[in-house]
Amino acid sequence: MKNILVVITTAFVPTGGLTTVMMNYYRMMNKEEVKIDFASTNNPPQVLLDEIHASGSEYYQLSDRKNVLAYFFALKKLCRGYDAIHVHANSAMAVMELQAAIWAGIKIRIIHNHSSRSQHNLLNQLFLSLYRRSFTQAVACSDEAGEWLYGKNGFI
């Protein structure tokens, strides 16, 4: 059985588009072949936690990303023992999650971009080069989102 950690850097809420799509995929997966655990910085509603736990998965609440070092090292520790990480994010700032996974020895690092712009353009540009070298597979919710963060090629 493969162990996958899904990290959500945006809000993990039942009515959000990202959560809806992600949970639809999760519900369809064969949980005898793959164990998927979730982590985010917010406290999701009990209805989501109940569904996750009822399916044999775990949820981990991470500290705020604003405390960069504490967040990074806690995530690195959590990543140990997982075969893959799938990070849902909106910018190259997800380099923190990807680098924590690298430091923890995770070989498969999937990034999933959900936006075509960033609120932090300067930081996005600053981290973009390292970010693009930190994932093994890239996914985007649209061509526009993919081209904005990954360039013209190399994403699905």
Sequence positions of predicted segments:
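Membrane-interface segments of envelope glycosyltransferases acting on lipid-linked substrates or membrane lipids
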Residues: M1-I156
